[in-house]
Swiss-Prot record:
Protein name as catalogued: Biotin synthase
Necessary cofactors: [4Fe-4S] cluster; [2Fe-2S] cluster
Cited Gene3D superfamilies: Aldolase class I
Pfam families per record: BATS, Radical_SAM
Keyword hit for Oxidoreductase: no
Entry's Gene Ontology molecular function annotations: 2 iron, 2 sulfur cluster binding; 4 iron, 4 sulfur cluster binding; biotin synthase activity; iron ion binding
Source organism: Chlamydia felis (strain Fe/C-56) (Chlamydophila felis)
Group of enzyme by EC: transferase
Example of a GO biological process term: biotin biosynthetic process
Length: 331
């Protein structure tokens, strides 16, 4: 398990975030190289197995039934269709397949049974499986574990203070409780947030601090950049500067030396050169495929060309390192 190895205060994380950029990148890169094989990148493929019609009011989400967006509710995908998509992605280089469903929480019904079969099928193909299914009970989490689920995504989105301004239908403590349920069942936790929603730098630091104060660090920390969607309350938000994105990536790497730091939604905003800087600064995971739920992502062929250009290798599935993280102040 990726256990918490040192105490991080808000002030300490703030100092890291505000470090002069060359020093920040150097420190983050040294930590990355100390804990992961060089030039290795995890490629994850995301499948929206149940799109639209969610009852939650997340201000950033096109899948909420409360907003007038171009996303229409769709029935849950068939098992065979999901397995076909996963097989194609794995053949194209993906080593983790993420299954996302637009609903508030898991129900004990035939849909959950289908998800368990999807997990078993994809795991048998040799890929890690991650699910983002909302809140769940200990019993459901145990069933997911027994089916072979590798990781469970449940983002905190932002700091607890800012969270209240973007979501009212689910409490911050509900999200923390879900993380506890997942951890207790033995499933790895994937948890990060979104930048560019109107939050402050202190909110971004607060999110990292909340995660750093947990008993176990997340196995993966996705850093998403808001993709403003017409019809949502955040449709007019400005995209954060590249330097804000880079600082967030580097700080996450330093605070979570053994975690996968994922350059997630919003990567399509970045040039190959900017993405390269993010990889140097600690990002070692991306989403691979043209679509992320309801928003565009980089073309898979373009990503393959980028990896070849940079001399990067696909990180094999089930290859999480067991070494202890670097303990020195400078690594």
């Amino acid at each position: 398990m990726n256990t918490r190895h040192e105490q991080w205060s808000l002030e300490t994380i703030k100092e890291v975030y505000n470090t002069p950029i060359f020093e920040l990148i150097h420190r983050a890169n040294a930590i990355l190289r100390s804990n992961f094989p060089h030039s290795e990148l995890q490629t994850c493929y995301l499948v929206s197995i149940k799109t639209g019609g969610c009852t939650e009011d997340c201000a950033y989400c096109a899948q909420s039934s409360r907003y007038q967006t171009n996303v229409k509710p769709e029935p849950m995908m068939k098992i065979t269709e999901v397995l076909e998509r996963a097989k194609h992605a794995i053949e194209s280089g993906a080593t983790r397949v993420c299954l996302g469903a637009a609903w508030r929480e898991v129900k004990d019904n035939h849909q959950f049974d289908r998800i368990l079969e999807m997990i078993k099928g994809i795991t048998n193909m040799g890929a890690e499986v991650c699910c983002a299914l909302g809140m769940l009970t200990p019993s459901q989490s145990e069933k997911l574990y027994d089916a072979g689920l590798y990781a469970y995504n449940h983002n905190l989105d932002s700091s607890e203070g800012f969270y209240k301004t973007i979501i009212t239908t689910r409490k911050y403590e509900d999200r923390l409780k879900t993380l506890d349920v997942v951890e207790q069942s033995g499933i790895s936790v994937c948890c990060g947030g979104i930048i560019g929603m109107g939050e402050t730098t202190e909110d971004r630091i607060g999110l990292l601090h909340t995660l750093a104060c947990r008993e176990r660090a997340p196995e993966s920390v996705p850093v998403n950049v808001l993709w403003p969607i017409e019809g949502t309350p955040l449709q007019d938000q400005q995209t954060p500067s590249f330097w804000e994105i880079l600082r967030t990536i580097a700080t996450a790497r330093i605070v979570f030396p053994l975690s996968m730091v994922r350059l997630a939604a919003g990567r399509a905003f970045l040039s190959v050169e900017q993405q390269t800087l993010c990889f140097i600064a600690g990002a070692n995971s991306i989403f691979y495929g043209e679509k992320l739920l309801t928003v565009d992502n980089n073309d898979m062929d373009e990503d393959t060309a980028m990896l070849n250009l940079l001399g990067m290798r696909h990180r094999p599935a089930f290859s999480r390192k067991q070494e202890q993280p670097c303990q020195s102040a400078t690594c």
